[in-house]
Amino acid sequence: MRNVFWRQIRLLLVVFIGYLFHVTVMTQLDTTVSINLPLVILSVVIVGYPRYKAFWGGAVYGILLETMVPGVKLLNLVFYPICAMLMSLFFTDKSAARLQYDMSNHRRGRNRSVYLRTPLCALCATLLYEAVSIIYIAMSSAELTSAFFTRALTDALMTTLTAVVLMWPLRRLLGFGAPVSKAMAKG
């Protein structure tokens, strides 16, 4: 019980420290695009925790970014929880019942590597965020140029690379050990 409590406290700290780094450190970097640090942390949470905690993390980021960071009205408040739930459909661990069902239907009944799913989750979430942003720009009657799409792809790649770098320390901080291989589990 005590371990579960401290794991929740660590999750809360990671979410809030990630928000603080996003609004302080990431805005000071001298780059043309901003790395979306909340999506990096959400991708680690989505892969490591159940769906309701992914929604909780997305809701916290949505509320904080909506109230503290000026931008498109209600975009962050709506986007982050929906994105967390949508990405959790594809990137969370399969339940034991789902694994058993897959194996009974002669399919591959196993989860993919967390070290593959985390960057893919960050990439998909960032591409979704950039697509929503580009659609909003197009709806506001602005002319879309190739610079918008170049920045969107650059942001997606930089966010994915940041997820690759930060997933190991974040997983250790959140209390996830290295995945156990089948050979180690048997022996």
Model-inferred region functions:
Residues 1-187:
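Terminal, non-globular segments
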